Amino acid sequence: MPSAPRKQSKTYKVPRRPFESARLDAELKLAGEYGLRNKHEIWRVALTLSKIRRAARELLTLDEKDPKRLFEGNAIIRRLVRLGILDETRMKLDYVLALRIEDFLERRLQTQVFKLGLAKSIHHARVLIFQRHIRVGKQIVNVPSFVVRLDTQKHIDFALSSPYGGGRPGRCKRKRLRSQEGGEGEEAEEE
């Protein structure tokens, strides 16, 4: 346990109305499109987005030349640009308010693996990540919700230890190869 205890807080916020049909349909569509396992993953992103938008709204109430607005506003924008959520052509606080949940879901490792063509489907991408077949740079990442930065996006690849990345073949393939070698040996003995 760390020496300084931290205050734990919830990472997601449940909707105020649990059975609002329009929201339920929208969440189901998002979960299917981005291969999410449950609604908590959507709510977690929604909470992150709401915190960022709340900070941007508070900063927009200040005067344009206010040093706090300039400093904190630039920090928020720089962070979003580095993550690839905000485009470099739209580096203003007004554009931060226009962000959507989809902008954050696009930057997940699961989505990026599928978009790069390393996986056959978005669900296959999730399985590949969980089974430690994907690396970002030199680091194997097994968290589908890992947020990929712009500079590390080009380093997403199969892990060197993975059968997909030229590593040792999988258990079934090794068994098949062994049985083929054994079958060839028996044929030679019969002749």
Curated annotation (Swiss-Prot):
Other information = There are 2 genes for uS4 in S.pombe.
Quaternary state and partners of this protein?
A: Component of the small ribosomal subunit (SSU). Mature yeast ribosomes consist of a small (40S) and a large (60S) subunit. The 40S small subunit contains 1 molecule of ribosomal RNA (18S rRNA) and at least 33 different proteins. The large 60S subunit contains 3 rRNA molecules (25S, 5.8S and 5S rRNA) and at least 46 different proteins. Interacts with snoRNA U3. uS11 interacts with MPP10. Component of the ribosomal small subunit (SSU) processome composed of at least 40 protein subunits and snoRNA U3.
Query: What cellular component GO annotations does this protein have?
Result: cytoplasmic stress granule; cytosol; cytosolic small ribosomal subunit
Q: Does the keyword 4Fe-4S apply?
A: no
* Alphabetized InterPro entries for the sequence: Ribosomal_uS4 (IPR022801), Ribosomal_uS4_CS (IPR018079), Ribosomal_uS4_euk/arc (IPR005710), Ribosomal_uS4_N (IPR001912), S4_RNA-bd (IPR002942), S4_RNA-bd_sf (IPR036986)
- This chain belongs to which protein, by name? Small ribosomal subunit protein uS4A
Return the similarity comment. Belongs to the universal ribosomal protein uS4 family.
Instruction: Enumerate the UniProt keywords alphabetically.
Output: Cytoplasm, Phosphoprotein, Ribonucleoprotein, Ribosomal protein, RNA-binding, rRNA-binding
Instruction: Give the gene symbol.
Output: rps901
Modification type Phosphotyrosine: residues: Y164
Q: Name one GO biological process term.
A: ribosomal small subunit biogenesis
> Short name of one Pfam family for this protein?
Ribosomal_S4
Q: What is its main location?
A: cytoplasm
Q: Which residues form the S4 RNA-binding domain?
A: 107-181
Q: Which PANTHER family match?
A: 30S 40S RIBOSOMAL PROTEIN (PTHR11831), 40S RIBOSOMAL PROTEIN S9 (PTHR11831:SF5)
Tell me one GO molecular function of this protein. Answer: structural constituent of ribosome
Q: Using the record's annotations, give every residue carrying the modification Phosphoserine.
A: S50, S161, S179
Cited function: Component of the ribosome, a large ribonucleoprotein complex responsible for the synthesis of proteins in the cell. The small ribosomal subunit (SSU) binds messenger RNAs (mRNAs) and translates the encoded message by selecting cognate aminoacyl-transfer RNA (tRNA) molecules. The large subunit (LSU) contains the ribosomal catalytic site termed the peptidyl transferase center (PTC), which catalyzes the formation of peptide bonds, thereby polymerizing the amino acids delivered by tRNAs into a polypeptide chain.
Where in or outside the cell it occurs: the entry states: Cytoplasm
Record keyword Zinc present: no
Provide the residue span(s) of the region labelled Disordered: 166-191
